[in-house]
């Protein structure tokens, strides 16, 4: 399967390189996401397109791309390699596997501006990029923890659902969550701190696969009928509304009584719908459209040698049933 993804990625790059006169006219600002199968990243694409429509006379074009599958870490690294070889003007990367991406950047030593968007490189490797544009992911985890504490002041049993084990943004959110609950930095696992205990078998890792995320939720609910809280550090399961509805149908009575609470990251349309149906208690929303919309301008600043802030944070939206805010119907 990975071979097929690599072929698709290479074919995409070759097709772009063969674009003829248009490719000569416009210099390319590339945004490389973790995978084209994730609707969160489609919002970044819409932001990229919006920038292009608002800057028709620019000498630059905004190119949104990524491997076909979010699970194809090697494909993403290869795509970045191919784009740098092709000669894009600048590149913004959301690294799926931060150490692997950093290792390749060290090897190819691109002379073009490199930045990260949505997800960053590991702290030790951040000199390899000029800036990060996206969410304050540690703060996002803090805000998730605050909702858990508000909804269940006494704590309880909890399962965290994470993405890729090497994704810096997801790990930062998990750290923010655990540190806030425990009131101590560097908390690796909750074992009674603040009244909360992570159950055996958790955290679970989705590897950014939506179907797996829903199956994991179903399995956890079945194996732990008295679970107090399930936290989707990213939105994965909710990106498939039918599957997510089926999974939460089995625990709707517990959700309605707040015996079981669900807190999730992101506020894409299917997630807002699920929230308004009572299938989650709080959503902490990122702003991916803004990331895609702002990334080209930041890359142009870097090309021009201008100073840019590092990091550049986009905001967060909090939805609760008491104050639905962004998620209001």
Model-assigned labels for residue ranges:
Residues 8-17:
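Bacterial N-terminal signal peptides
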Residues 1-9:
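Bacterial N-terminal signal peptides that target proteins for export
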Residues 3, 21-329:
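A residue-level marker of the well-folded mature domains of exported/periplasmic proteins
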């Amino acid at each position: 399967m990975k071979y097929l993804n690599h072929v698709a990625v290479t074919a995409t790059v070759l097709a772009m390189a063969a674009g003829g006169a248009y490719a000569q006219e416009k210099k390319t600002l590339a945004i490389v996401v973790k995978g084209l199968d994730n609707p969160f990243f489609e919002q970044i694409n819409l932001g990229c397109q919006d920038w292009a429509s608002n800057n028709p006379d620019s000498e630059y074009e905004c190119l949104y791309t990524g491997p076909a599958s979010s699970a194809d870490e090697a494909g993403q690294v290869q795509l970045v390699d191919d784009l740098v070889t092709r000669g894009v003007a600048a590149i913004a990367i959301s690294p799926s596997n931060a150490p692997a991406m950093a290792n390749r950047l060290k090897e190819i030593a691109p002379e073009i501006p490199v930045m990260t968007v949505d997800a960053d490189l590991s702290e030790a490797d951040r000199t390899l990029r000029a800036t990060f544009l996206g969410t304050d992911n540690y703060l996002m985890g803090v805000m998730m923890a605050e909702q858990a504490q508000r909804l269940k002041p006494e704590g309880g049993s909890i399962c965290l659902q994470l993405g890729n084990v090497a994704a810096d943004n997801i790990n930062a959110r998990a750290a923010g969550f655990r540190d806030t609950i425990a009131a101590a930095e560097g908390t690796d696992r909750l074992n009674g701190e603040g009244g909360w205990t992570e159950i055996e078998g958790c955290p679970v890792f989705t590897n950014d696969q939506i179907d797996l995320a829903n199956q994991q939720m179903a399995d956890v609910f079945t194996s732990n009928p008295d679970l107090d809280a399930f936290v989707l550090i990213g939105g994965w399961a909710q990106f498939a509304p039918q599957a997510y509805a089926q999974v939460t149908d089995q625990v709707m009575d517990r959700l309605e009584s707040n015996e079981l609470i669900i807190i999730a990251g992101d506020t894409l349309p299917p997630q807002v719908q699920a929230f308004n149906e009572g299938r989650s208690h709080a959503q902490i929303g990122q702003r991916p459209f803004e990331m895609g919309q702002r990334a080209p301008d930041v890359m142009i600043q870097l090309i021009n040698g201008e100073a840019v802030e590092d990091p550049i944070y986009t905001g967060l939206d909090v939805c609760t049933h008491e104050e639905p805010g962004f998620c209001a119907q």
